[in-house]
Curated annotation (Swiss-Prot):
EC number(s) stated in the UniProt entry for this protein: 6.3.5.-
Protein name as annotated: Aspartyl/glutamyl-tRNA(Asn/Gln) amidotransferase subunit B
Family: Belongs to the GatB/GatE family. GatB subfamily.
Gene Ontology BP annotations: glutaminyl-tRNAGln biosynthesis via transamidation; translation
Alphabetized SMART domains for the sequence: GatB_Yqey
Matching Gene3D superfamilies: 1.10.10.410, GatB domain, N-terminal subdomain
Catalytic activity reported: L-glutamyl-tRNA(Gln) + L-glutamine + ATP + H2O = L-glutaminyl-tRNA(Gln) + L-glutamate + ADP + phosphate + H(+); L-aspartyl-tRNA(Asn) + L-glutamine + ATP + H2O = L-asparaginyl-tRNA(Asn) + L-glutamate + ADP + phosphate + 2 H(+)
Quaternary context: Heterotrimer of A, B and C subunits.
Organism in which the protein naturally occurs: Methanococcus maripaludis (strain C5 / ATCC BAA-1333)
Function: Allows the formation of correctly charged Asn-tRNA(Asn) or Gln-tRNA(Gln) through the transamidation of misacylated Asp-tRNA(Asn) or Glu-tRNA(Gln) in organisms which lack either or both of asparaginyl-tRNA or glutaminyl-tRNA synthetases. The reaction takes place in the presence of glutamine and ATP through an activated phospho-Asp-tRNA(Asn) or phospho-Glu-tRNA(Gln).
NCBIfam families from the UniProt entry: gatB (TIGR00133), PRK05477.1-2 (NF004012), PRK05477.1-4 (NF004014)
GO molecular function, one term: glutaminyl-tRNA synthase (glutamine-hydrolyzing) activity
InterPro entries registered for this protein in UniProt: Asn/Gln-tRNA_amidoTrfase_suB/E, Asn/Gln-tRNA_Trfase_suB/E_cat, Asn/Gln_amidotransferase, Asn/Gln_tRNA_amidoTrase-B-like, GatB, GatB_C_1, GatB_Yqey_C_2, Gln-tRNA_amidoTrfase_suB_CS
Gene this chain is encoded by: gatB
Amino acid sequence: MSEDLSMKCGLEIHVQVDTNSKLFCQCPTNYKDVEPNTNICPVCIGHPGAKPMPPNKKAIDMAIMVAKMLGCEMVIDKDIYFQRKHYNYPDLPSGYQKTSVPIGEHGKFLGVGITEVHLEEDPGQYKPDLGTVDYNRSGTPLIEIVTDPDMKSPEEAREFLRQLLRLFRYIGNLRGEGTMRADTNISIKYNGIQGNRVEVKNVNSIRGVYKVLKYELIRQKNVLRRGGEIKLETRAFMESQMITKGMRSKETADDYRYIPDPDLQPIVLNNEWVEKVEAQMPETPMNKEKRFVEQYGIKEDDAKVLVSDLELADVFEKVVAELGNDKDGISLAVTWIRNELKRVLVYNKLEFFETNLRPEHMVELINSIKDKTISQKIGKTIIEQMVEHKGEKTPKELINEMGLTVIEDTSELEKACEEAIKNSEKAIEDYKSGNQRALNSVVGQVMKLTRGRAEPATVVEILKKKIDG
């Protein structure tokens, strides 16, 4: 019997704004590299009578920018007030979290509806296994993005988050996946039976969200298949086991006892404020991708790879400009940045900014290949060494250090070709019988003998002269 299974998923994504001070006080937002409970004050640890400052202007601007880039309608000329969201947990010393009503609503990103974008404060960090709480993080500004339940598979949700994080990198001033947390909401329909919505809280990676959704899809299907009922509940993600575990019944808005915060004046956005923020908005990844195809005449796949990393895209444009902005320069830049540099970055699990390479390094490398100072094979070795040395050595320094310039002495090349011919009797016979490809293995022998320092086209020319007479 065939199974009829479908799922709906919505996400609540929390991303930290990279500000110097917290949302409602002047405490620094650095909480990773300091002693516990040092970057705190009466406001961020909820002392009775401590009055919050007006919300951090940069955090509001970033929330506006995120909302606009997600296609939201801005809440203009209306009170945007902060509410107290009440719940009891050790990481929330005041007993409530300050969270704004929506700043932007009804957006769309990659076909997924954006319900709302709003600001809130991050709670502290509670470690139940140790029984300790660090309040350094308490009060750090968070932007929360709430999606409609439009994602139909774990794979869709994973791709949505990947593209959203790419957008965050383009926007800047957001702290990305290392601090991103997502609450996942999933419900399934199995053979006509609709299950209740289940929320899994505080999943802190794209991989985690994917694993949660895969696990919940199977778990809920098995419950319904056995005639059980899916509870409307909140569950926790047990990352070490890659499973979810029931925490409590699902809360409603009434459970949080939302009330406007009497200590904070409402924010009122106007068109002038929003337009100022819009003027600072960067080009979106999707627009950059389209522009690369149109402006540089490169393939869509190449543009997609280049644009996937903002720094890589910037390097590409700078290198193309240095190489003359012509067809040959663009082709070389694509080959050595999109293909070779990206290959080395992926292998080493690095982003471009982590390598300390500069655009001029890539220009110097490509020019060394263009003027035949080094072969393409050696170029691949040099790019690997450039990344390994974290940009401390230029391509020319590495080429000279390693003695990797192209062999220009014809007699040296002829000697290597003669040795390769001597060791490749079968390949020579096949070549003489009409198999042109057989010569490739002989060329490979020469490249090996010369440590890649021979120019392949020159090697082929010498080999043909010697074999064909």
